[in-house]
Swiss-Prot record:
It comes from Cupriavidus necator (strain ATCC 17699 / DSM 428 / KCTC 22496 / NCIMB 10442 / H16 / Stanier 337) (Ralstonia eutropha). Disulfide bonds: none annotated. GO terms for biological process: translation. PANTHER family: 50S RIBOSOMAL PROTEIN L32, LARGE RIBOSOMAL SUBUNIT PROTEIN BL32. This is Large ribosomal subunit protein bL32. GO terms for molecular function: structural constituent of ribosome. Belongs to the bacterial ribosomal protein bL32 family. One of its GO terms (cellular component) is large ribosomal subunit. Keywords: Ribonucleoprotein, Ribosomal protein. Residues 1-59 are annotated as: Disordered. It comes from the Bacteria.
């Protein structure tokens, strides 16, 4: 089992964690409807990459 030799100071601990922050989810704009949606996901209107792939209630 691994055991640390020396205690890591709060400064070094913070530097180690500095890249663990969350980033904003990348959004894409649907070319057909102009809606924003998560990348690689179907838009709320049922469009994906310019094509209708899911029937919605409005159809």
């Amino acid at each position: 089992m691994a055991v640390q030799q020396n205690k890591k100071s709060p400064s070094k601990r913070g530097m180690h964690r500095s890249h663990d922050h969350l980033s904003a989810a990348p959004l894409a704009v649907e070319p057909t409807t102009g809606e924003t949606h998560l990348r690689h996901h179907v838009s709320p209107n049922g469009y994906y990459r310019g094509r209708k792939v899911i029937k919605t209630k409005n159809d």
